[in-house]
Amino acid sequence: METNGSFSGARLVDGKWIIPESRRKDGSVRRERAVKPGYTAPEDIKRYRPGRGNFASLEKQMKKLQLSNDASTSKSIDRPPISELEKEKLERPLSNKKKEKNDHKAESLKHDYDSVGEKRISKDSVKHLDKTYSSIDSKKDFKYNFPKTQAPEWRRGAKPLSKTSEPSVYSEKMSKRENKKSINTVDKKTGYKEKE
């Protein structure tokens, strides 16, 4: 039993709605699949078309992608040929001042490097190295101020808490509280409620 459905080309086959295998507009193949009544395939839904344009938003995005791919190709192909004036500017000789500057730079580079290609050490750079090494040496004797040395003397002399069998202050207070019945006041030192 086969009847044509009203949605996305679906047909009723043996009590199930099935969209048969078909080709989409873009050329891809849609597999045969079972669907519920009222199903509309995404390809069959009309796309939003903006008021001014005549392309759907997806089509516009595809065009933008194509344009960006075209722009990524080399730009030298699109560049117009060099005019005669530009050629003349490129061929003009350098002025005397520019020539002197270029020659001076070349000479200074020659002086900086030996014939082997290693860079010479100038007197200024040696002085700079001496300063850095002296500052490093002076920092070797530096003592860091750890919290132990920064604490006041009365605190440095305090004994650390010992783990002995003696009951602590906290456990004594707890035993006193257990003996008392009502909870009325708060101890100002500990913040615990005391029983009276």
Swiss-Prot record:
This is Uncharacterized protein C19C7.01. Residues 21-35, 84-94, 100-143, 173-196 have a biased composition (Basic and acidic residues). Residues 21-53, 65-196 are annotated as: Disordered. The lineage of its organism: Eukaryota, Fungi, Dikarya, Ascomycota, Taphrinomycotina. InterPro entries: PYM1 (IPR039333), WIBG_mago-bd (IPR015362), WIBG_N_sf (IPR036348). GO terms for molecular function: RNA binding. Residues 66-75 have a biased composition (Polar residues). It comes from the Eukaryota. It comes from Schizosaccharomyces pombe (strain 972 / ATCC 24843) (Fission yeast). GO terms for biological process: exon-exon junction complex disassembly; nuclear-transcribed mRNA catabolic process, nonsense-mediated decay. Signal peptide: none annotated. SMART domains: Mago-bind. Pfam families: Mago-bind (PF09282). SUPFAM superfamilies: Pym (Within the bgcn gene intron protein, WIBG), N-terminal domain. Transmembrane segments: none annotated. PANTHER family: PARTNER OF Y14 AND MAGO, PYM PROTEIN. GO terms for cellular component: cytoplasm; cytosol; exon-exon junction complex.
